[in-house]
Design a protein with these regions (language model features):
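Residue position within the beta-strands of beta-propeller blades
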Residues: 10-12, 54, 92
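Repeated scaffold domains used in trafficking and secretory/extracellular systems
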Residues: 1-5, 37-50, 76-89
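Extracytoplasmic beta-rich ectodomain segments of secreted or membrane-anchored proteins
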Residues: 1-15
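Surface-exposed loop/turn elements that mediate protein-protein interactions on large endomembrane-trafficking
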Residues: 17-38, 58-76, 97-103
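Hydrophobic, glycine-enriched assembly/anchoring segments
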Residues: 81-103
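Intrinsically disordered, low-complexity regions
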Residues: 4-7, 31, 50, 95
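Short loop/turn segments that connect beta-strands within the blades of beta-propeller domains
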Residues: 19, 48-49, 56-58, 86-87, ...
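Structural recognition of beta-strand segments within beta-rich domains
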Residues: 45, 52-55, 62-63
Length: 103
């Protein structure tokens, strides 16, 4: 899910493949709240409540709707998907297990 409370997250990329893109949050009227240039692979994005989680190849970053980093976890190597919860915690889902990240 890419929708949080009063915002939606968008991951924009100019090319079909590649890792250069832009992470954008927009409000319910479609107006931009914040944006962040992304120069690396994004594996998954999830939003809920006031938080947005982005899984990069080497770390998990939890942002607020203004795309300010709230928490970072380095090295979740086996995580394939993330599920952000309303309290800012993130369920990190792997092929055969899941862990809860509590910032």
């Amino acid at each position: 899910d890419l929708g949080g409370d009063g915002f939606t997250a968008l991951l924009l990329n100019r090319y079909q493949s590649g890792s250069v893109g832009r992470l954008v949050t927009v409000d319910d009227d479609g107006e931009e709240i914040a944006s962040l240039d992304v120069a690396e692979e994004v594996r998954d994005v999830s939003a809920c409540g006031r938080y947005l989680s982005v899984l990069y190849a080497d770390r998990l970053v939890v942002y607020n709707r203004q795309l300010q980093a709230y928490a970072t976890l380095h090295g979740p190597e086996h995580t394939r998907e993330v599920l952000t919860r309303a309290d800012g915690s993130v369920l990190m889902i792997g092929a055969d297990s899941a862990e809860l990240f509590l910032p």
